Amino acid sequence: KGTFWVNNVNQYKRLAICGGIYSNYLALQQLLEKCKKLGVDTIFCLGDIGGFGPHPDRCFPLLRKGRVETIAGNYDISLAQERKDCDCGYTDPRDNYFAQASYNYTFAHTSKENKVWMKTLPSQQRFLLGNLKVLVCHGSPRQTNEFLWESSTPNHLLEKFAVDYKADVICCTHTGIKWHRTLAHNKHFINVGVVGRPNS
């Protein structure tokens, strides 16, 4: 595993990382335009392309044209596998009610072609940012729909992820709320937030 980081990963100097697009193609357009002006090497999207917004199929051409490196979120996996729900991981019945309504709409308005494309998405990706070993995923390195809240996630769990996955920086999304924590040995855990919904 030690040589994995040296021989088999891409290396970047400047990049952008975002979370859920949630069918908000207008927000995605703005992101792509801003990244072009900033001259980033590449853009990573950490999953959940569809959901909540009205036009999921308008996002996919933008992702492809922008050559956005996309990770599979729980929404993408469920749509690709034609599951009955989004596998969001909610425990509150009210959240599940609205999530189901959103998923049903997104499923009906996502083309077969795009569902097939989502089957090709990886669950995580590794790369070098300068000398830093970076791992990007959706929920956590161990589970796509794991909620890691800033208020309740202990340092020792995040530090264990850094050790187990040999990463200096781990980036995720899923909760939709951005936060950053510096850990022991100058490791970092970052929730990048989302593009397509308010930060709440």
Task: Please tell me what each predicted stretch does.
Residues 27, 49-66, 79-91, 147, ...:
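Metal-dependent catalytic neighborhoods of phosphoester/phosphodiester hydrolases
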Residues 8-16, 126-135, 183-188:
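Beta-strand-turn-beta hairpins that frame and shape the catalytic cleft
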Residues 151-200:
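Conserved beta-sheet core of the metallophosphoesterase superfamily
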Residues 116-150:
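Internal, conserved structured core segments that host functional sites
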Residues 1-68:
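N-terminal active-site segment of His-dependent metallophosphoesterases
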